[in-house]
Amino acid sequence: MQVNIFYIQKSDEFKTWSEKYSKLISKYGTLKEINVFNKKIALAQNLNAIEAKKSYEEAFMPYKKGYCIALDERGKDLTSIEFAKLIQDKNELSFFIGGAYGLREEFNQSLDFRLSLSKLTLAHQFVKTLLLEQIYRAFCINNNHPYHK
């Protein structure tokens, strides 16, 4: 399975944890983590939320392939087992984590699924790490590995 995570961030304070789960995931499939942060996004974020969200969408559009999932606090809450079922038997998964202003509603609606990891607003760096852990957990569930007890 091909797993793609597209995100927007300047730095990664959770890099050690992200690397740990990336390595574990590689036992089950191919993982690509792509940071699309660029100068246009940096400038747009200094203007306003509307321009920032537009710049995020422009950066993400070329990567919409496979089964596409937006990470969104207004998305659907799933248990780890439900998440494992959702991603099971997919050839390619693409996850989109918005920047500081989130994602435009129109972009979210254009994807296959909207996933909420929490009703709380979370730092996007933390969301990526949490998502990696849940992807690994889902692979373990789907492969009867004892990580998920």
Swiss-Prot record:
Q: In which broad location class does this protein mainly occur, judging by the first location in its UniProt entry? A: cytoplasm
EC no. given is: 2.1.1.177
**Can the keyword Repeat be found in this entry's annotation?**
no
Q: Which domain of life is it from?
A: Bacteria
The record's SUPFAM superfamilies line, in alphabetical order, gives: alpha/beta knot
Query: Where found?
Result: Cytoplasm
What are its GO cellular component terms? cytoplasm
Disulfide-bonded cysteine pairs: these are none
Q: Which GO terms describe its molecular function?
A: rRNA (pseudouridine-N3-)-methyltransferase activity
Which reaction equations make up its catalytic activity?
pseudouridine(1915) in 23S rRNA + S-adenosyl-L-methionine = N(3)-methylpseudouridine(1915) in 23S rRNA + S-adenosyl-L-homocysteine + H(+)
UniProt entry keywords in alphabetical sequence: Cytoplasm, Methyltransferase, rRNA processing, S-adenosyl-L-methionine, Transferase
Residues bound to S-adenosyl-L-methionine are 71, 98, 117-122
State a single Pfam family of this protein.
Answer: SPOUT_MTase
Could you tell me which CDD domains the record lists for this protein? RlmH-like (cd18081)
Query: What does this chain do?
Result: Specifically methylates the pseudouridine at position 1915 (m3Psi1915) in 23S rRNA.
Question: How does the annotation summarize its subunit structure?
Answer: Homodimer.
Identify its protein family.
Belongs to the RNA methyltransferase RlmH family.
Q: What is this protein called?
A: Ribosomal RNA large subunit methyltransferase H
State which gene encodes it.
Answer: rlmH
